[in-house]
């Protein structure tokens, strides 16, 4: 049964881990240097709601006597 040749594993795994470490560090550094801009508050016009424009009758359940 042939043996698995692992001599090149160290030369592959080490640069890969180094690259992943550098990428994560750059991402963290970039997020701390440039915080997200705060949202700009604009004045909004209040919208007319349909239930505020017209009067609606409120019905009571049939089991209750009418309330005047």
UniProtKB/Swiss-Prot annotation:
Membrane topology term: Single-pass membrane protein
Protein name as it appears in the record: ATP synthase protein 8
GO terms classed as biological process: proton motive force-driven ATP synthesis
Keyword Transmembrane tagged: yes
Subunit structure: F-type ATPases have 2 components, CF(1) - the catalytic core - and CF(0) - the membrane proton channel. Component of an ATP synthase complex composed of ATP5PB, ATP5MC1, ATP5F1E, ATP5PD, ATP5ME, ATP5PF, ATP5MF, MT-ATP6, MT-ATP8, ATP5F1A, ATP5F1B, ATP5F1D, ATP5F1C, ATP5PO, ATP5MG, ATP5MK and ATP5MJ. Interacts with PRICKLE3.
Family in the record: Belongs to the ATPase protein 8 family.
Any one Gene Ontology molecular-function term assigned to this protein's record: proton transmembrane transporter activity
Entry's localization field: Mitochondrion membrane
Source organism per UniProt: Pongo pygmaeus (Bornean orangutan)
GO cellular component: mitochondrial membrane; proton-transporting ATP synthase complex
